[in-house]
Amino acid sequence: LRRECDALNPVFFHYITARTPYVALKYAMTADGKLAARTGRSQWITGETARAHVHSLRSRYRAILVGVGTVLADDPLLNCRMEGGRDPLRVVLDSRLRTPLSARVCRTAQTQKTIFVCAVENAQKRAQLQALGAEVLCLGGADGRVDWVALMRELGAREIDSVLIEGGAEVQYSADRK
């Protein structure tokens, strides 16, 4: 009976018991197991139905998380394009704050809450991102990368109950390890 109850609302039950967000990993892959074209160039590998489902997920999850690689490759907005949908908090893992200030996640940070999470402090870039309306958290781990456990605790403390990871292979791999 407990499993059946938990299955009714996994986000709520996870958040209430762990005080960290429920995390879901969203990715698409080609028939040969790739996440992008052979050239390394990212491209749509799904159809309209799958893309509509992604926007439904973005509306339901409180935060969407990607890595700097996705920002550099795709320059995404990370918003919800579904009518009546809610834009999620954007969380960008960027260990060394390499995201260009011209990126769409930076240019739209005044209108859609955005948090950059770094592992190495860069006061100048922090100030530039903050001037654009973004928040910067420095949560470096012993390995020089973002500390996932600290990040999940921080998001939980901010009452972010769910995170949709849409990052590329590196973010997926590091999330899976934690």
Regions found by a protein language model. Name each.
Residues 1-10:
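Active-site loop-to-helix "anion-binding N-cap" substructures in soluble metabolic enzymes
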Residues 11-31, 35-161, 170-173:
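Active-site ligand-binding patch in enzyme domains
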